[in-house]
Amino acid sequence: MAEPSLVAAGEEPEERAIEAALRPKNLDDFVGQHRVRKQLSLVLKASRMRGRSADHVLFSGPPGLGKTTLAMIVAAEMNAPLRISSGPAIQHAGDLAAILSSLSEGEVLFLDEIHRMSRPAEEMLYMAMEDFRVDIVVGKGAGATAIPLELPPFTLVGATTRAGLLPGPLRDRFGFTGHLEFYSVPELELVLRRSAGLLDLKVNSAGFSEIAGRSRGTPRIANRLLRRVRDWALVHGVDQIDARSASAALDMYEVDKKGLDRLDRSVLEALITKFGGGPVGLSTLAIAVGEETETVETVAEPFLVREGLLGRTPRGRIAMAPAWTHLGYAIPAGVFGQEQLDLFDRETGAEVTGEWAPESQ
């Protein structure tokens, strides 16, 4: 079983209180996601001007980018109470009916992991979202009757990491859909500056940059790394965190310059040293690193593929040229991805230009 990772995007239970304290409370304080913020701000402002509940909202994107925070901001901006539940908790239509029937007018219902809701509950949600009404079935068999239950107008905010699993009829009932993207390093630095202020930490610009560069483009990870660097600084008597102290702290936690942790590096090391860069089957690779197949596939692979370090092919997994370079190995001829590296000077990083020649006929 994989040990807990500092760079896993999922939220740990013990982090929830700290995360809640660091969450922005309004759109003005929310850093990043400029396009989604601008569009959402307009939707909410128009709803307030009309004096009506906001349209139903769906946020999609990888974990840790702010979907839950934005749901809370929707409720705050609409000055409405917030009810929180999740897809896995709603396994029967009756579970959903109980929640919907207790909503007050204008209330915001947040359903996290909405794609994991049961199909009967999804079908009940269609009518609730569109007509603010549900049919409660009483009895069984031929004697069963449907009793209509009117609902007060409410706003549903759904969040999903797998929008493709949502049925089309459900997606179509959301009046606004916002897809959240990974953050740039400068955006993460802004997130860290805000969090450091709330935590009363002294961090210079180089320190913020060092932490942001290892945060995988994810604010949740950035805040987690900041707290671990804070612990290191406290124990070592460091008053102001700079690049050197941040690097020393994160090196101790085995989070490298690219944000790779022990498992990530183990996967790449095994690919290169045991299988010559691949291709190798997923199950064989998992055995080589001493982890479950699902752990390698769901925990390590997404980030490695996104960073261009690992490739998936019909014949198996392969180590891309940047993986060889990152781990300090010489790249053998024919490694996939080497062509992209050869466009740049390996020492200076400057683009290599040459005289263009037409292909031979």
Curated annotation (Swiss-Prot):
Its main location: cytoplasm. Residues 257-361 are annotated as: Head domain (RuvB-H). It is found in: Cytoplasm. ATP binds at L22, R23, G64, K67, T68, T69, E130, D131, F132, R173, Y183, R220. Residues 1-183 are annotated as: Large ATPase domain (RuvB-L). Belongs to the RuvB family. Has 3 domains, the large (RuvB-L) and small ATPase (RuvB-S) domains and the C-terminal head (RuvB-H) domain. The head domain binds DNA, while the ATPase domains jointly bind ATP, ADP or are empty depending on the state of the subunit in the translocation cycle. During a single DNA translocation step the structure of each domain remains the same, but their relative positions change. This is Holliday junction branch migration complex subunit RuvB. It comes from Pseudarthrobacter chlorophenolicus (strain ATCC 700700 / DSM 12829 / CIP 107037 / JCM 12360 / KCTC 9906 / NCIMB 13794 / A6) (Arthrobacter chlorophenolicus). The gene is ruvB.
